[in-house]
Amino acid sequence: MKIKLVVVGKLKEKYLKDGIAEYVKRMGTMLPLEIIELADEKIPDNASEKEAEALKKREGDKILSRIQTGDKLAILAIQGKLMSSEELADFVKKAEVYGTGNLVFVIGGSLGLSDEVYKRSDLQISFGRMTLPHQLMRLVLVEQIYRAQMINRGSAYHK
C-alpha cells in the first residue's frame, strides 16, 4: 500500500515545501507518500453560484481521475469527523492491513469539493472549524500522516 495526497493547487512557499519534504524524507520507505498536485481552476471575479459549482465539478473530476477502484478515500472537510492523532493512526493501520488499494487523502481547492468527491469518500476528516490556508493544511496533514505511522510503530515521536 502507498499513501497518496491529492491536492488542488500548487505549493508556493519555500518554508512549507521544506517542511513537507522533511516529513516525506522521514517516512522513507515505511509507507511511501506520493503527493499529486492538480491545477486549480481559475475563479473569475464575481463568479455566479452556477459557475462556482461548475468549477468545483471540474476540479472534482480531476481528483476522481486519480482515485482507483480499491483505494480508500479520506477527504478534508470542515464538517467532517474530528479525530485524534490516535484515531487517524488506527484508520491508517486498518487501511494498510485490510485495504485492497492505496490510501488517498484529498485537499480540495478554495471552493471546496464537488458532491461527487463527497459521495466517493470513505471518510471525511475535519481538523476543526477554523479556516486554514490550503498550503498550510498540506503541511499539517503530512505531519499527521507521519505521526500516525510513528504511533503505529510504537515510536516515542508521539508523546
Curated annotation (Swiss-Prot):
An MF annotation (GO) of this entry: rRNA (pseudouridine-N3-)-methyltransferase activity
Entries under InterPro entries matching the protein: Alpha/beta_knot_MTases (IPR029028), RlmH-like (IPR003742), tRNA_m1G_MTases_N (IPR029026)
GO cellular component, one term: cytoplasm
Keywords: Cytoplasm, Methyltransferase, rRNA processing, S-adenosyl-L-methionine, Transferase
Compartments where found: Cytoplasm
Listed EC numbers: 2.1.1.177
Subunit structure: Homodimer.
Family note: Belongs to the RNA methyltransferase RlmH family.
HAMAP family, per database record: 23SrRNA_methyltr_H
Protein name: Ribosomal RNA large subunit methyltransferase H
Organism this protein belongs to: Lactococcus lactis subsp. cremoris (strain SK11)
Source taxonomy: Bacteria, Bacillati, Bacillota, Bacilli, Lactobacillales
